[in-house]
Design a protein with these regions (language model features):
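A conserved segment at the C-terminal end of the G1
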Residues: 1
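Flexible active-site lid/hinge loop adjacent to a nucleotide/diphosphate
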Residues: 4-123, 154-160
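Short amphipathic alpha-helical face segments that pack within enzyme cores
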Residues: 14, 169-175
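A generic structural signal for residues located within well-ordered alpha-helices
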Residues: 74, 92, 165-171
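C-terminal accessory "lid"/substrate-recognition subdomains
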Residues: 110-134, 144, 165-166
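Acidic-glycine-rich active-site phosphate/pyrophosphate-binding loop
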Residues: 130-154
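Gly/charged, well-structured mid-domain segments that form the phosphate/adenylate-handling core
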Residues: 160-165, 175-181
């Protein structure tokens, strides 16, 4: 209803607490940045869905993070804070992200830009859930049963599939929605 609580960078725990403490807020999508986690925690106790899209070198050397494993450990706190009946969404194309799966104590959904990703295929063959690209379309699957969610051509943010980082974000968001039901 056009109610703005705060403008600007709202990726930290203070912003999350402000947002979640507002009685008008019924649901929230929060970006939880590495620096904010280190300085003030997550800003919430438990979530219904936790998503880790990637782990990259862009923040190494900051806040005592010397290698990708340090950064992965910090980001894994997002998974540990998912409610047991909730869902963790992980990028099957990023081996370091995928290696965090044991830290999740909830249902897992993998996403991948590649329909033949080995981890994704194994997870689906075991009855798991996943979201992937197939023939220029976003597909959501449970076990061996999949359904087309949307063609990439209908998503301008992906530049017709050329902006791979945004395609990956679409897959992650689709997986999060699948996780919510």
């Amino acid at each position: 209803d056009d109610h703005c609580l705060l403008r600007g960078d709202t990726t930290g725990p203070w912003s999350a607490r402000l947002l979640l403490g507002d009685p008008l807020v019924e649901a929230a999508v929060l970006e939880t940045a590495r620096g904010g986690i280190l300085r003030g925690g997550l800003g919430y106790d438990l979530s219904d869905v936790g998503v880790i899209t990637n782990i990259s070198r862009d923040h190494l050397g900051q806040d005592g993070l010397e290698d990708l494993e340090d950064l992965a450990f910090v980001k894994s706190l997002v998974l540990e804070a998912v409610h047991p009946e909730g869902c963790a969404v992980l990028n099957a194309d990023d081996p370091l992200v995928a290696s965090l799966a044991p830290r999740a104590r909830c249902r897992l959904i993998y996403f991948s830009l590649k329909e033949d990703n080995v981890l994704l295929r194994r997870h689906l063959s075991e009855g798991g859930e996943g979201v992937f690209l197939q023939g220029g379309q976003v597909v959501a699957a449970r076990g061996e049963e999949g359904m087309v969610v949307v063609p990439l051509a209908n998503l301008p943010v992906t530049w017709y599939g050329q902006a791979q980082h945004n395609v990956a974000n679409v897959l992650a968001a689709t997986a999060a929605c699948l996780g919510l039901g």
